[in-house]
Each structure stands twice: as structure tokens, then as C-alpha cells.
Amino acid sequence: MTLSHAQTPLVFIVSGPSGSGKSTLVQKMLEVPGTMFSVSCTTRPPRATESAGKWYDFVSEDEFERRVQSGDFLEHARVFGKHQYGTPRRWLDEAQCKGLDLVLEIDVQGAEQVKQKLPHAVAIFILPPAKEELERRLRARGQDSEEAIKRRLERAEQEIRRYTAYDFLVVNDDMDRAGREIQAITIAARCLRSCLSQRAHNILESFGG
């Protein structure tokens, strides 16, 4: 499904701390017809459950820097002072050509860059219900050391402090409900005046106005 030719495709930004459930909620968004996912580029190594090209393209530091210098990224940032992440511009071009809404799963640094370049992008922040629950989820994943969990919790606080920069907040205390909420946001955002102004103009013209 593509959007109406008179409807402007949207860019959705989804951010949230590690363990907030944002990746699962992004999958819920992609169940809404007319959406596509922006595959991020990163210098970090793939995890055991990850395959290249689905959620991330994995590249070397040299390759990432080459792409930065070439202006290939809509946004890019170094996370935890370690690995780099970036959103290739080609996904935005492809979404616009296909008439699809584009979903970006990016951190708060990247979100700020995108909002500066695309002020009408719809930004959604995923909140955990509490610090204790976030810590429980991080431990349950079994992927991180104690030091890494501590760093993630510290970063989570820093990220949550920036929630006011976002248009919508989803508290993920129940995945089913949070999934319905983020799908509702995806659909409702398409009814924004900024998205439908051209269509409204065309309708008005049909009256001879």
C-alpha cells in the first residue's frame, strides 16, 4: 500500500533507552500498511541473533567515516563514546519515491539532528514504567556485564531527561497496549493538516474554490 499522491509521506522517529522495548514497538509500527523501515548503519559488531541488512548494516570505522565525508548520512552519532550509528539518506529518498512513511529507530542525538533537518518529522519516545523495571529487563536479556548495565541505566536517565523534545510518549508497561498506542499514533499522524493540506486544497478546487 502506498499513500495517496496528494498526501505527504511522513518520517517517524522512535527513540528510547535500551530495554524500553522500542525495537518490538517499531515492528508493530511496520505492521501498519504504507510504512517502511530505515536500516541504520553501524560500526559495532553484529550480535548472535542479528543478520546484516535487516535492522543494521555493519561496516568498519573507515567505511563509516568515508560515508560521513561523502554526506551519505541524514544523521550520525557515536553512542557510549564507542560505536557509531548513522541513517543513510537513501532510505528517505526511497520512501519518498515509493510514497511510504519512513520509520527511523535512532537515539536522542540522531533524533535532534533529524528534527533540525526535517522539522515536521513525528518523534516518539518510548518510556519504561520505572528504573527498576528497566534494570530487570536489561538483566533478563543476559547480554551485558554489570558495568555495561550500569552504563546503560546512566544513559537511560540522560535520554529520558530529553523526552520534552518529542511529540508523543509511549509508556511501555504492557507491550500489547503500547503496540496499539504506537500504531494509533502512526495512523493519526497521517491526519495532520500538514500531511493533508494538498488534498484539502484539491477537494476545495473541486467545488470551484
Predicted regions and their residues:
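ATP-dependent small-molecule kinase phosphotransfer cores
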Residues: 42-102, 109-112
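P-loop (Walker A) phosphate-binding loop of NTP-binding proteins
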Residues: 15-17
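Post-Walker A alpha-helix
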Residues: 25-26
